[in-house]
């Protein structure tokens, strides 16, 4: 009876199927949106030393240009998600993209550090309207058979956006100035936002609801109480925390003996992020064949293997280890995020918002806490810390595999 009911619901909903014109439009739109979002978010990372030099800042103070945006973005996702339940998915994503692009261009004209940090905080808040809602749009509008593949392509767009944002801003800042680099990133993002607005089909399976604060909190509570979703939230926390920590401190290692790499050479390590362009959609395809749980476990193990490989003091082998680690990370994130979207039958936006909240929270917590291990044991300490957390992620994945575990609450 339940199976017949689920089939009837699938027929009633107007899902977008793979290999159709609308599906291709969704891919182009979400790719453009992901590119704009993460190029704006990470464009300042490569020019933090320039901020330090111009405004006489310590590295910690300079990092506020990035951390101010990520903090407000993670917090904003808890509110912009439910807000989209009222005004619609496409409306809030389009508005958020245009606001973020405009704020980035305005930021390029600022001459005081406080103004830059404030504008970056507002930019992060605006971007939360895209990050929190895009995954929900995909899970609502894309046919379940194509959901994982589409989610993987969306994450690929995010990956390319983050990579090009870092690379382009670095080149333009060195050639001209940091303000020119931000202006160009803002203009490119504005154009990408236009593509997003034009190509993204309006929601067909979305029903507008009024905000009830108590009901909204209750929905968040239900998602946290659900064991499957809660474990996926923790896995997301571990994933992003591990990824950011490794790339935060690998530069310090490669500046030391026996490598002595310069800053520009270390900056090229961001090209490793492009492994996500392949591994994210590939994981989506493999999920339909081997199921999500198996793909998640294998992807986490790839991260662990990659990190073990980086223990060798040969540059080529370290880079190989980072490539394997990154490929496993993007495959894991694509798998876990699509799992959250498909598993949460009710309050999808709250489930997605919580996953992304934990995901970016892991970046802040691990990135800072990793400094303790670097100070005492350098790269070995970082590796032991991250490998331990990844094994905990594998443990949670095996717990999710237990048949008697499904659909249970704490």
Swiss-Prot record:
GO cellular component entries: plasma membrane
Keyword Hydrolase: no
Key words of the record: Cell membrane, Membrane, Transmembrane, Transmembrane helix, Transport
Subcellular localization, as worded in the UniProt entry: Cell membrane
Principal location class: membrane
Pfam family, one: MFS_1
Cited CDD domains: MFS_NepI_like
PROSITE patterns: MFS, SUGAR_TRANSPORT_1
Taxonomy, superkingdom: Bacteria
GO molecular function, one term: transmembrane transporter activity
Statement: the UniProt record of this protein carries the keyword Cell membrane: yes
Record field: transmembrane: 27-47, 63-83, 97-117, 118-138, 145-165, 180-200, 228-248, 254-274, 293-313, 316-332, 355-375, 378-398
Gene3D superfamilies in alphabetical order: MFS general substrate transporter like domains
Membrane topology: Multi-pass membrane protein
Family: Belongs to the major facilitator superfamily.
Name under which the protein is recorded: Uncharacterized transporter BU588
The organism of origin for this protein: Buchnera aphidicola subsp. Acyrthosiphon pisum (strain APS) (Acyrthosiphon pisum symbiotic bacterium)
Lineage: Bacteria, Pseudomonadati, Pseudomonadota, Gammaproteobacteria, Enterobacterales
């Amino acid at each position: 009876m339940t199976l017949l009911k689920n089939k009837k619901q699938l027929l009633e909903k107007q899902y977008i199927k793979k290999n159709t014109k609308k599906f291709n439009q969704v891919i182009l739109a979400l790719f453009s949106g992901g590119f704009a979002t993460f190029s704006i978010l990470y464009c300042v990372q490569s020019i933090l030393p320039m901020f330090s030099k111009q405004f006489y800042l310590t590295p910690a103070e300079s990092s506020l240009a990035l951390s101010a945006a990520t903090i407000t973005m993670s917090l904003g996702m808890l509110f912009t998600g439910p807000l989209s339940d009222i005004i619609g998915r496409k409306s809030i994503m389009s508005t958020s993209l245009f606001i973020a692009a405009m704020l980035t261009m305005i930021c390029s004209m600022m001459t005081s550090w406080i103004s830059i940090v404030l504008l970056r905080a507002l930019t992060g808040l605006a971007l939360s309207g895209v990050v929190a809602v895009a995954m929900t749009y995909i899970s609502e509008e894309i046919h379940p058979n194509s959901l994982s593949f589409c989610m993987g392509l969306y994450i690929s767009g995010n990956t390319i956006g983050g990579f090009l944002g870092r690379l382009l801003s670095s080149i333009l800042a060195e050639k001209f100035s940091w303000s020119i680099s931000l202006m160009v990133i803002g203009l490119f993002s504005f154009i990408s936002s236009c593509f997003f607005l034009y190509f993204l089909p309006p929601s067909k399976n979305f029903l507008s609801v009024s905000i009830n604060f108590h009901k909204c909190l209750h929905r968040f509570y239900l998602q946290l109480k659900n064991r499957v979703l809660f474990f996926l939230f923790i896995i997301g926390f571990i994933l992003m925390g591990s990824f950011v920590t490794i790339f935060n401190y690998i530069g310090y290692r490669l500046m030391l003996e026996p490598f002595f790499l310069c800053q520009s050479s270390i900056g090229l390590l961001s090209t490793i992020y492009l492994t996500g362009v392949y591994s994210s959609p590939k994981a989506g395809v493999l999920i339909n064949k081997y199921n999500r749980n198996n793909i998640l476990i294998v992807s986490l193990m790839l991260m662990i293997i990659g990190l073990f490989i980086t223990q060798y003091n040969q540059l080529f082998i370290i880079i190989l280890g980072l490539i394997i680690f990154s490929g496993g990370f993007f495959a894991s994130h694509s798998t876990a995020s699509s799992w959250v979207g498909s598993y949460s039958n009710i309050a999808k936006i709250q489930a997605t918002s919580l996953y992304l909240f934990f995901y970016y929270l892991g970046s802040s917590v691990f990135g800072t806490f990793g400094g303790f291990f670097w100070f005492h044991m350098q790269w070995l300490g970082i590796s032991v810390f991250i490998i331990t957390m990844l094994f905990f992620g594998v443990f949670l994945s095996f717990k999710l595999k237990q048949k008697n575990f499904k659909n249970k609450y704490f």
